[in-house]
Amino acid sequence: MDLFVYQWFCDGSQEIRAYAVDSDSSTVCVRVTGFRPGFYVETASCQAVTRALQDFRDVSAEKRVRDHLYATRGSSVPFVWVTFRCWFDARKASDVLVKAGFACHQCRAQPVLQLTSLRDLPTCGWIRLGKGAVQVKREKYSRCKREFIVQWEQVERGPDVPQPEVTVVALDLEVNSEVENAMPKDRPGDEVFMAGAIILRPGKKPKRVLLSLEADDYPEAEVLAERGYAVQQYPNERSLISGLCDMLSSVKPQVVTGYNVLGFDIDYLLKRCVRLGMEEELCLTGMAAERPAKERTISWSSSAFGAQKYSYLDWEGVVAVDLLPIIKRDYKFDSYRLDFVTETLLGSNKDPVTAADIFRAYATRKMDVVGEYCVKDVQLCVDLMEKLQVWVGLTEMAKVCRVNAFTLFTQGQQIRIYSQVYCHCEKNGYVVTDPADGKRVPWGQDPPVSDEPDEDYIGAHVVEPSPGIYDNVVPLDFSSLYPSIMIAKNVCYSTRVDPGTPGSETFTWEDHLNCVHDPRKVEYERLSSELWDLDSEARELRRERDAIPRKRVDDRRLVVDTLNTVLDAQRMLRTTRAALKNQLGTKTVCACRLLAFLEPATKKGVMPTILTDLLDGRKRAKKAKAEAKDSITKITMDKRQLAYKVSANSMYGAMGVKRGYLPFQDGAMTVTYFGRQCIEKAASIIGSEHGGQLVYGDTDSNYVTFADAKTPAELWDKAVAVAKAVSSVFPPPISLEFEQVIYTKFLILGKKRYIYLSCDRDGNSSGKMGFRGVLMARRDNSGLARKAYSITAQALLEDRDPWADLTPLMKDMYTKNCSLRDFVITKQVGSWCRECAFIEQGADSIVAVGDYKIRDLEKAKAETRKITGTDGGPEYMAVLYKLVMAQLPGHVQLANRMIGRGETVADGTRLEYVVLRPSYDGKKRRFRGQGLSERLETSDYYKRFAEFLELDTEHYVKTLVNPLDQLLTTAGRPEDEFKAFYGYRVNYRKVVEDIKTLRACPEMVKIVSFKKK
């Protein structure tokens, strides 16, 4: 019998449960019995281990000889493999053995990983049950249509065919807030009063249901049927939630999805059930008939998913799929609100229903409009899921990474790498030692010295470019450079040996960054010394100038001219020094490296083998996609090749961490060193042997021009030939590839910052501009800023006057003919400490506020003592919090103000805000000294009070001065061209404000008369 497993589950008992769908898309529960989880103990004595575990029942110990994954820790080492009845016993036993002085390994590997590794089973995919599988007819554990009990030896990998469809329920809750203008916070009156659901069953039409409290304005059933949904009304919140639970129990979905369904809907539903004393009813909506799901709280962050913190239910047989973190990972949007996302990806718009409308609907019992809005929101989630093929992508990624699909939401990248490494090691005689188990020591003893260096290492090589516009540039990239280096040079935990070992390759180099051997650091110190001398000279000149009587005009002018020359030199040196400091960064490295790894012919490493399998798997998937005749296979193969690619590129990152599952900085620094060598060698060969000029080199890419190529076709063929010739110099699979595009115009501003126009071999161009690292690529700029930058860059690349396009845009800005969306700036808020938590901690324990450093904590403490007259206590901490918050970025201060107004701002939220205009002081003839942070407000707040507020157009223009002037100067335009325009506008605005003040209140304006000389 073949089944498609979509979830493995182990609660620590003596059986592992697999939830699967058959070819008819019905849910099947497979109860795998007889499997004994275990771990390795580093000792040669089975008796010593069994004596230490004499209080445990049914312990099995077997002596095995294995290699450590970390080769420096030994090979052919005696271990004892210890197995237990269940995972509960295994975890307790590992603690007992560690306290007894034994080193235990692979304690991280949970039973599901051990079983799927031992039997080569997919974590998401087809399995086959042997003839020994017994169908359970009575006293079933689950509510599945069919249930089987099978010994673990009777389960094997199934055929690789397209997966069946699954039953999906998409959800969206509408919740009241008893506090006006504040988000719901599970207060008594913050009731769930509406739940929209769409049920998607394979082969059937979608069923749309709206569960709602009783309302006065729902139309007749026939009208609702024309809209495409039915309404079920309930007298109170308890019965509504009970109805929702009954629906989930009857439908038995394999997937529950929604937009922010983990971050809000399920979390909030659970809180309301706890408040109403009915949490068990919700917890029993999974596939387990008698075992209620347990509440879990997760908190983690990654560069892909950002900060993740939520509570969820560990349902058996039901996978919660949240669309929000997936879209955050795959798309860089200004905003992740559902209306913006669907408009961008689907071209669909949400109904213009606000939070106030929702709260009003609850209060007035006029719920029809909000109900239709709720169902449409759920439909948008369904459309997003189908368009992005989210479920197929998750299952393919889970299969490649050897983890459950839900683990992709609840844990970061390292568990995926660990699972793949574990599976390979288990089959090939390695024991996975990692810092959390192999290095654990008994209580009272000092931990052993770490194998890994504490110092940093130098990263990828970037060639400092000469800013300017270049014609006909071709990009030549190394394909999967770091994975290819790991394969070619056999860089792995398992191949690290002492230098000079027969059959090994030795790498030796020096890393110098920000140390006395770094030429840039030497130059930085020289500039600092010169600036010190110039400061002394400037002080002397000022004293000399002040000592000269004003009547001696010529003598005084001579000294002033000399002083101005010194000040100009200072400014130039400070600019140069600042650029150097930016290059040097804060990291300091000063080391001589000497590392060796076994050659592939001697012994192929674990990581190179895994990477080879991943890259080969990707090639097979891409080939299968090209040959596929049906859309399902095409989609599956596309998602699979993407999963292989992401997983392969993540292997290097797992080694480079200082702390984690499998840190190995020796390997990471060797890979980056050889990567730098590859870039430099390729650039040298391209220049010396093929007549190419290197414009820019970055990590794994070279941007080159060839003067002898006169047409796009010649340049194209030349690039292909050069890439092939250079690739032959490097060991496979390292290869340089032409990216199949010509940059007809390439404007480079600095490292990782460039703009281009491209064409194909025939010279055909779409005219669309590409870019990287410039203002347009950053989401924390307003739409107007990006629009102004874009039209300026486009004009420069097309050799047109940028002011022809820029002037109308500036006119629209100043005359307020732009939409509010153009003025909105978005920025992500990290984690920061709320006031109540801050006050509870002591002043001495304060180092940072969540993710944010405090610029001058001592100054804030001194001011607090001055204000409160105390050195501690709640009042002191409350004042200190306000002063510390004033040192944080403006958008964080805005988030804190929003919380003070009763709004909810979760960590990782992207705030949408605008900059408001400061008030003008007519008496002092200047704008009041409001800081920028005080003038930030959310776009929603501005909409509500737009008649009393005004946007600060000058601020938006000011943010363009440096970027546009750099762009214009790089393209050969006059210096400070846009700065002059901005200065004119500032002066014009001051004159206008003075005139307004004079008309309104003439006595407040100081009239200065100038006498004729």
Curated annotation (Swiss-Prot):
Its EC number is 2.7.7.7. Keywords: DNA replication, DNA-binding, DNA-directed DNA polymerase, Nucleotidyltransferase, Transferase, Viral DNA replication. Belongs to the DNA polymerase type-B family. It comes from Frog virus 3 (isolate Goorha). Gene3D superfamilies: DNA polymerase family B, C-terminal domain, Helix hairpin bin, Palm domain of DNA polymerase, Ribonuclease H-like superfamily/Ribonuclease H. This is Putative DNA polymerase 060R. GO terms for biological process: DNA-templated DNA replication; viral DNA genome replication. One of its GO terms (molecular function) is DNA binding. The lineage of its organism: Viruses, Varidnaviria, Bamfordvirae, Nucleocytoviricota, Megaviricetes. It catalyses: DNA(n) + a 2'-deoxyribonucleoside 5'-triphosphate = DNA(n+1) + diphosphate. DNA-directed DNA polymerase involved in viral DNA replication. It comes from the Viruses. Pfam families: DNA_pol_B, DNA_pol_B_exo1. InterPro entries: DNA-dir_DNA_pol_B, DNA-dir_DNA_pol_B_exonuc, DNA-dir_DNA_pol_B_multi_dom, DNA/RNA_pol_sf, DNA_pol_B_thumb, DNA_pol_palm_dom_sf, DNA_pol_type-B, RNaseH-like_sf.
